[in-house]
Protein backbone atom coordinates (compact mmCIF):
# COMPACT_ATOMS: atom_id res chain seq x y z
CA UNK A 1 0.00 0.00 0.00
CA UNK A 2 0.91 3.63 -0.29
CA UNK A 3 1.48 5.67 2.86
CA UNK A 4 0.37 9.28 2.95
CA UNK A 5 1.07 11.91 5.64
CA UNK A 6 -1.71 14.46 5.96
CA UNK A 7 -2.46 17.24 8.46
CA UNK A 8 -4.85 16.06 11.15
CA UNK A 9 -6.32 17.98 14.06
CA UNK A 10 -5.87 16.02 17.29
CA UNK A 11 -5.83 17.22 20.89
CA UNK A 12 -3.34 15.74 23.32
CA UNK A 13 -0.96 16.90 26.03
CA UNK A 14 1.57 19.33 24.57
CA UNK A 15 4.46 17.44 26.18
CA UNK A 16 3.38 14.26 24.37
CA UNK A 17 3.21 16.15 21.08
CA UNK A 18 6.68 17.64 21.62
CA UNK A 19 8.22 14.26 22.34
CA UNK A 20 6.74 12.81 19.14
CA UNK A 21 7.59 15.71 16.82
CA UNK A 22 10.09 16.07 14.00
CA UNK A 23 10.64 19.56 12.54
CA UNK A 24 7.52 20.89 14.24
CA UNK A 25 5.29 18.15 12.81
CA UNK A 26 3.69 15.64 15.21
CA UNK A 27 3.90 12.04 14.00
CA UNK A 28 2.78 10.18 17.10
CA UNK A 29 -0.49 10.11 18.99
CA UNK A 30 -1.42 8.65 22.34
CA UNK A 31 -4.94 7.18 22.60
CA UNK A 32 -6.95 8.32 25.61
CA UNK A 33 -5.89 10.84 28.22
CA UNK A 34 -2.26 11.14 29.29
CA UNK A 35 -1.83 10.59 33.03
CA UNK A 36 1.64 11.30 34.34
CA UNK A 37 2.25 9.00 37.31
CA UNK A 38 5.94 9.39 37.93
CA UNK A 39 6.22 8.85 41.68
CA UNK A 40 8.39 7.18 44.28
CA UNK A 41 6.92 4.06 45.88
CA UNK A 42 7.94 3.00 49.36
CA UNK A 43 7.54 0.24 51.92
CA UNK A 44 5.10 2.08 54.21
CA UNK A 45 4.97 -0.83 56.65
CA UNK A 46 8.73 -0.86 57.22
CA UNK A 47 8.94 2.94 57.32
CA UNK A 48 6.48 2.90 60.23
CA UNK A 49 8.19 -0.04 61.94
CA UNK A 50 11.57 1.70 62.11
CA UNK A 51 9.99 4.93 63.32
CA UNK A 52 10.59 7.11 60.26
CA UNK A 53 8.26 9.94 59.26
CA UNK A 54 5.94 8.94 56.44
CA UNK A 55 7.03 10.57 53.14
CA UNK A 56 3.44 11.21 52.01
CA UNK A 57 2.65 12.99 55.27
CA UNK A 58 5.76 15.14 54.79
CA UNK A 59 4.54 15.95 51.27
CA UNK A 60 1.13 17.15 52.44
CA UNK A 61 2.79 19.24 55.13
CA UNK A 62 4.84 20.91 52.39
CA UNK A 63 8.06 19.53 53.89
CA UNK A 64 9.10 16.88 51.34
CA UNK A 65 12.07 18.86 50.00
CA UNK A 66 15.47 17.81 48.67
CA UNK A 67 17.24 18.56 51.96
CA UNK A 68 14.52 16.73 53.91
CA UNK A 69 14.92 13.75 51.57
CA UNK A 70 18.69 13.80 52.13
CA UNK A 71 18.25 13.84 55.90
CA UNK A 72 15.48 11.22 55.78
CA UNK A 73 17.64 8.81 53.74
CA UNK A 74 20.59 9.11 56.13
CA UNK A 75 18.44 8.68 59.24
CA UNK A 76 16.70 5.66 57.72
CA UNK A 77 20.02 3.97 56.90
CA UNK A 78 21.02 4.18 60.56
CA UNK A 79 17.86 2.30 61.50
CA UNK A 80 18.18 -0.44 58.90
CA UNK A 81 20.24 -3.63 58.95
CA UNK A 82 23.64 -3.63 57.26
CA UNK A 83 22.26 -5.33 54.12
CA UNK A 84 19.22 -3.03 53.86
CA UNK A 85 19.06 0.30 52.02
CA UNK A 86 16.83 3.40 51.95
CA UNK A 87 17.08 3.86 48.15
CA UNK A 88 16.45 1.14 45.58
CA UNK A 89 15.71 3.13 42.42
CA UNK A 90 16.41 2.95 38.72
CA UNK A 91 19.06 5.57 37.92
CA UNK A 92 17.43 6.94 34.75
CA UNK A 93 13.98 6.85 36.32
CA UNK A 94 15.21 8.75 39.36
CA UNK A 95 16.75 11.65 37.43
CA UNK A 96 13.67 11.88 35.19
CA UNK A 97 11.57 12.38 38.32
CA UNK A 98 13.96 14.29 40.58
CA UNK A 99 15.05 16.96 38.11
CA UNK A 100 11.56 18.29 37.19
CA UNK A 101 10.46 18.09 40.83
CA UNK A 102 13.16 20.68 41.53
CA UNK A 103 12.05 22.90 38.66
CA UNK A 104 14.35 21.61 35.90
CA UNK A 105 13.26 20.81 32.36
CA UNK A 106 15.42 18.06 30.91
CA UNK A 107 14.45 18.64 27.28
CA UNK A 108 14.10 21.77 25.15
CA UNK A 109 11.89 20.61 22.30
CA UNK A 110 12.19 23.82 20.26
CA UNK A 111 16.00 23.53 20.20
CA UNK A 112 16.06 19.76 20.11
CA UNK A 113 18.37 19.79 23.11
CA UNK A 114 18.76 17.59 26.18
CA UNK A 115 19.75 19.76 29.14
CA UNK A 116 21.79 17.40 31.29
CA UNK A 117 24.68 19.87 31.60
CA UNK A 118 22.79 22.50 33.63
CA UNK A 119 24.38 22.93 37.06
CA UNK A 120 21.01 22.41 38.76
CA UNK A 121 20.78 19.01 37.04
CA UNK A 122 24.41 17.93 37.42
CA UNK A 123 24.12 18.62 41.16
CA UNK A 124 21.39 15.96 41.30
CA UNK A 125 23.64 13.49 39.46
CA UNK A 126 26.40 14.31 41.97
CA UNK A 127 24.05 13.65 44.88
CA UNK A 128 22.95 10.35 43.36
CA UNK A 129 26.60 9.29 43.08
CA UNK A 130 27.18 10.33 46.69
CA UNK A 131 24.16 8.32 47.87
CA UNK A 132 25.58 5.27 46.07
CA UNK A 133 29.17 5.75 47.24
CA UNK A 134 28.18 6.36 50.86
CA UNK A 135 26.00 3.24 51.07
CA UNK A 136 22.47 4.65 50.93
CA UNK A 137 21.61 3.24 47.48
CA UNK A 138 21.25 -0.51 47.04
CA UNK A 139 24.21 -1.55 44.83
CA UNK A 140 22.30 -4.63 43.67
CA UNK A 141 19.66 -2.60 41.82
CA UNK A 142 20.03 -3.69 38.21
CA UNK A 143 18.00 -3.09 35.07
CA UNK A 144 14.85 -4.85 36.28
CA UNK A 145 11.72 -2.72 36.79
CA UNK A 146 11.26 -3.98 40.35
CA UNK A 147 14.17 -5.27 42.40
CA UNK A 148 14.20 -8.51 44.35
CA UNK A 149 15.31 -6.71 47.50
CA UNK A 150 12.37 -4.28 47.42
CA UNK A 151 9.88 -7.13 47.03
CA UNK A 152 11.62 -8.93 49.90
CA UNK A 153 11.21 -5.90 52.18
CA UNK A 154 14.94 -5.10 52.41
CA UNK A 155 14.80 -1.64 50.82
CA UNK A 156 12.53 1.36 51.39
CA UNK A 157 12.09 3.59 48.33
CA UNK A 158 11.67 2.36 44.74
CA UNK A 159 10.84 3.83 41.36
CA UNK A 160 7.73 2.69 39.50
CA UNK A 161 4.36 3.50 37.94
CA UNK A 162 0.76 3.14 39.10
CA UNK A 163 0.14 0.13 36.86
CA UNK A 164 2.92 -1.74 38.70
CA UNK A 165 0.62 -2.10 41.73
CA UNK A 166 -1.67 -4.69 40.12
CA UNK A 167 0.87 -6.27 37.81
CA UNK A 168 2.13 -9.78 38.58
CA UNK A 169 5.57 -9.11 37.10
CA UNK A 170 6.08 -5.76 38.91
CA UNK A 171 4.70 -4.96 42.42
CA UNK A 172 3.11 -8.41 42.61
CA UNK A 173 -0.22 -8.18 44.55
CA UNK A 174 -0.20 -9.84 47.99
CA UNK A 175 -2.79 -12.47 47.03
CA UNK A 176 -0.60 -13.84 44.23
CA UNK A 177 2.28 -16.28 44.61
CA UNK A 178 5.38 -14.36 45.67
CA UNK A 179 3.29 -11.25 46.22
CA UNK A 180 4.47 -8.24 48.23
CA UNK A 181 3.37 -8.62 51.85
CA UNK A 182 3.62 -5.01 52.95
CA UNK A 183 1.72 -1.78 52.38
CA UNK A 184 3.10 0.31 49.52
CA UNK A 185 3.02 4.09 49.87
CA UNK A 186 3.38 6.58 47.03
CA UNK A 187 4.88 10.07 47.09
CA UNK A 188 6.02 12.62 44.47
CA UNK A 189 9.73 13.28 44.10
CA UNK A 190 11.11 15.81 46.61
CA UNK A 191 10.80 19.50 45.76
CA UNK A 192 13.48 22.18 45.72
CA UNK A 193 14.25 23.60 49.16
CA UNK A 194 13.08 27.08 48.12
CA UNK A 195 9.85 25.88 46.49
CA UNK A 196 6.76 27.79 47.65
CA UNK A 197 4.05 25.40 48.88
CA UNK A 198 0.74 26.58 50.29
CA UNK A 199 -1.03 24.10 52.58
CA UNK A 200 -4.84 24.12 52.52
CA UNK A 201 -6.05 24.23 56.14
CA UNK A 202 -9.76 24.45 55.25
CA UNK A 203 -12.07 22.84 52.65
CA UNK A 204 -11.35 24.15 49.14
CA UNK A 205 -12.15 23.58 45.47
CA UNK A 206 -10.14 23.33 42.27
CA UNK A 207 -10.68 22.85 38.54
CA UNK A 208 -9.55 19.45 37.22
CA UNK A 209 -8.00 18.79 33.80
CA UNK A 210 -11.46 18.24 32.29
CA UNK A 211 -12.68 21.64 33.46
CA UNK A 212 -14.81 20.29 36.29
CA UNK A 213 -14.96 21.87 39.74
CA UNK A 214 -13.86 19.46 42.47
CA UNK A 215 -14.86 20.19 46.07
CA UNK A 216 -12.44 18.95 48.76
CA UNK A 217 -14.28 18.68 52.07
CA UNK A 218 -12.43 15.87 53.87
CA UNK A 219 -9.01 16.30 55.53
CA UNK A 220 -5.92 14.28 54.66
CA UNK A 221 -5.57 11.29 56.96
CA UNK A 222 -2.20 10.26 58.38
CA UNK A 223 -1.04 6.67 58.75
CA UNK A 224 -2.62 6.62 62.23
CA UNK A 225 -6.03 7.21 60.65
CA UNK A 226 -6.35 10.69 62.12
CA UNK A 227 -6.50 14.03 60.31
CA UNK A 228 -3.05 15.31 59.41
CA UNK A 229 -2.04 18.51 61.20
CA UNK A 230 0.41 21.35 60.56
CA UNK A 231 3.07 22.19 63.13
CA UNK A 232 0.66 24.78 64.55
CA UNK A 233 -2.16 22.24 64.88
CA UNK A 234 -4.26 23.19 61.85
CA UNK A 235 -6.02 20.42 59.90
CA UNK A 236 -4.58 19.74 56.43
CA UNK A 237 -6.89 19.30 53.41
CA UNK A 238 -4.33 19.45 50.61
CA UNK A 239 -1.43 21.37 49.09
CA UNK A 240 -1.25 24.08 46.43
CA UNK A 241 1.82 23.98 44.17
CA UNK A 242 0.76 26.79 41.83
CA UNK A 243 3.47 29.11 43.18
CA UNK A 244 6.13 26.41 43.44
CA UNK A 245 8.93 25.49 41.04
CA UNK A 246 7.72 21.87 41.03
CA UNK A 247 7.19 20.35 37.57
CA UNK A 248 5.39 17.11 36.80
CA UNK A 249 7.66 14.88 34.66
CA UNK A 250 6.75 14.85 30.93
CA UNK A 251 4.28 17.76 31.24
CA UNK A 252 6.34 20.80 32.19
CA UNK A 253 3.61 21.90 34.59
CA UNK A 254 2.80 21.79 38.30
CA UNK A 255 -0.77 20.46 37.99
Stretches with model-predicted labels:
Residues 68-76, 144-158:
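Short helices/loops that flank or line small-molecule/ion binding pockets
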Residues 175-255:
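Extracytoplasmic/periplasmic substrate-recognition and gating elements
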Residues 1-12, 49-50, 156-157, 176-179, ...:
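Extracytoplasmic "Venus flytrap"/periplasmic binding protein-like
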Residues 1-11, 58-61, 104-123, 194-200:
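Short, solvent-exposed loop/beta-turn-alpha elements that line the ligand-binding surface or hinge
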Residues 16-40, 48, 65-114:
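Extracytoplasmic/periplasmic solute-binding protein
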Residues 45-59:
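Aromatic-glycine-rich donor-binding/catalytic loop that engages nucleotide-sugar donors
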Residues 1-37, 197, 215-232:
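Hinge/lid segment of periplasmic solute-binding proteins
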Residues 69-75, 109-142:
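Glycine-centered hinge/linker elements that transmit conformational signals in sensory
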Amino acid sequence: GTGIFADWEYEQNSAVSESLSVRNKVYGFEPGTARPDYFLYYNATKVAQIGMEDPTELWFKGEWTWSTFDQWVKEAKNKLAADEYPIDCGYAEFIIGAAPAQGNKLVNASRGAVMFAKSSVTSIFDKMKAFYKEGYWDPKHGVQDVSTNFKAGKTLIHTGSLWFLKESTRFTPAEEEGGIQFKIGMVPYPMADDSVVNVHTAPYSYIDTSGNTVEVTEPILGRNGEALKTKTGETIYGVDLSESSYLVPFTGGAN
